[in-house]
Amino acid sequence: MKPFLNDDFLLTNETSKVLYHQYAKGMPIIDYHCHLSPKEIYENKTFKNLTEVWLYGDHYKWRAMRANGISEEFITGDASDEEKFSAWARTVPMTIGNPLYHWTHLELRRFFGIDDRLDEKSAPHIWERVNEQLAGGGFGARDLIEKSNVETVVTTDDPTDSLEYHVKLKDEDFNVSVLPGFRPDKAMEINQEGFAAWVRKLETASGMKIANYDDFLKALKNRIDFFHEAGGRISDHAINQMMYTETDESEVRPIFAKVMNGESASPEEECKFKSLTLHFLGTCYAEKGWAMQLHINALRNNSSKMYRKLGPDTGYDAINDQDIAKPLCSFLDSLDRKDALPKTILYSLNPRDNVVISSLCGSFQDGRIPGKIQHGTAWWFNDTKDGMLEQMKSLANIGLLSRFIGMLTDSRSFLSYTRHEYFRRLLCDVIGTWVENGEAPDDIELLGRIVKGICYENAKHYFQFEVKDRLKA
């Protein structure tokens, strides 16, 4: 029987151990999609206790606590931070089989040097030990990022954001590039309450009068230019339901005007607006050399009662089951036939779409940029051992795993970089197992080069992010 979480955790053979310890483990991290706060990074936010750094905003943990019968008072309610931590500690033993059990103990070990298992009995001791370390300094937001060997962090930012803290961080003595990620979801949701008010925010941010749809597009392009100047090289779109239809400005202009006058768009009109707007943005990304991320098939805010009480991103989302192949293919083709298809990363929250996405990527590779169209890493509910393995094997079966740009955290937590370790261990075990089974050659130099590429170098070449001078040496 193997000990829990030992040095060879998830590594089942000698080849995988060599690949991980000699090639993957020491590679820097390019975290090209996360939800960290640039303000907190700039201010090197400190944390008064373990609950603040670990449980605030972490809806993965919140879902597990609710499933374990924990009252909302001890999750998002008025209970003290220590009471909330105790409630989480009672839940942790019940998460065996869920990656939360692994992540929890990896984070305790890697950041705080605590090997004890967290449960109700160990909770007081762990609470005290971690809080002592947090109070002693060296555990601010920047410190935690640097401890994790991170080279680049890309945040998730609305087009109207000032990017004040990204700009300030450029001049800071901080060995990590913190870059903006362009997330124009509010520009797409024409029927969402507050759309017109958001357009006015866009007007202010761009310094441009928005009197019609053409002005709207110009203002969005203005903000893309602004993000580019701040180091932005990537966009992200949350597309809960993929839709696409051929249309043009003459059809969409009156739809935009209608909504700005307080009316709602019909489903057909909404599809036309989203199709043309996303197409326009795609051409802008291609002109700038950006990568476009599409996160597809999430079913969000399913409990209307709790959405009204707590708002979005609080643990009430699920996997959607929309068929995505035809509309996604039509959208990508609309850009490709105009030679305006940017580097694109496709994610689906539904694991049944793995083979669809892997095959679709191959339809639009251009023979110039290696892995131009990427099957994005396992996302959210698939951010598990099985989910990561399924995504990697699907990509390997149908595309080129060797050109994969690897892992991201997609997290609001400064402790989540252990997910990169988790991914790297699984990657090395997949490849190592092929070798042990005689399905791949025992060529450590070749395989090590592939592993280093997936862990770091492929993303570095793919995105071409600005790197601080001190990191180039």
UniProtKB/Swiss-Prot annotation:
GO MF annotation list: glucuronate isomerase activity
Keyword terms: Isomerase
Main enzyme class: isomerase
UniProt entry tagged with the keyword rRNA processing: no
Functional pathway: Carbohydrate metabolism; pentose and glucuronate interconversion
GO biological process, any: D-galacturonate catabolic process
SUPFAM superfamilies: Metallo-dependent hydrolases
Catalytic reaction(s) noted: D-glucuronate = D-fructuronate; aldehydo-D-galacturonate = keto-D-tagaturonate
Enzyme Commission (EC) number: 5.3.1.12
Classification via InterPro entries: Metal_Hydrolase, Uronate_isomerase
Keyword Isomerase: yes
Family: Belongs to the metallo-dependent hydrolases superfamily. Uronate isomerase family.
NCBIfam families: PRK02925.1
HAMAP family: UxaC (MF_00675)
Designated name of the protein: Uronate isomerase
Biological classification of the source: Bacteria, Bacillati, Bacillota, Bacilli, Bacillales
